[in-house]
């Protein structure tokens, strides 16, 4: 009789890996990246390349010289993804040295301080963006106009749709909203006066990325739909209450809402684990986004809303737990 050889568990292996998910999200970002190249040209290429290179370099250096890890993590795609998302949250005319500082905060403070991928409390790219917004508010809120393919530091700047909405609320003058691009232009990324951050300009490109990630089962619908749906409903009620508030379609197509809801809030590490927890998380992000956009110091509130709810993710996970195997379901 032959020997029975039993290997260590687990005996069943799936194809879902860190590398697969990271590179899957990177692929999903390609439509938005190509659109940013089309609208911003060399500025977009410089910002994204600098951000990605700096994030990869800082992760390698911290692993090797500070944490002294023998195994590098730069090949798993997480540093590249952080660099891309950070670049997507920046103006296309931002000086290179400021981008490098943002990458240092994203990787050094937002990720490696907690022990690396899987341990971070906050989304690293948003940590980098928030740090730059506090340290360099003028540079981080000066947005170049679209269609300047050969421009970088000398690009013309203009008012973004969110800035127009904010001005209408502050002044109480609803006619200011007439300056907004049409909903179709917002959807396609045609913002003639001021576009905003590179990755948030075209909702169509971001929705293509969402469709790809849902198809590949990289993410589920719960977080993006709950965020966008919450913002749509609340902004719709506000628009009905007063004409100084923009229509809900313009609100969800403007700023970083789509980018944040699809690519930032859905980060595995910093978002809740259960569908119910994800919906609670998404609704809270939507409410906070509306509050900060309309009554906060900055026109955009998506980044801060996500960071705030990142801090509450452990609490949500603690109180919204899946049923344990064998546990009796209460009737």
Which residue stretches match the model-derived regions?
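Structural signature of hydrophobic alpha-helical transmembrane segments
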Residues: 42-54, 93-102, 192-203, 245-257
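Membrane helical hairpin/interfacial module
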Residues: 34-86
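Loop-to-transmembrane alpha-helix initiation sites
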Residues: 121-125, 201, 249-256, 278, ...
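Long hydrophobic alpha-helical segments that form multi-pass transmembrane helix bundles
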Residues: 122-207
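Cytosolic-side transmembrane-helix boundaries in multi-pass membrane proteins
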Residues: 1-23, 65, 292-331
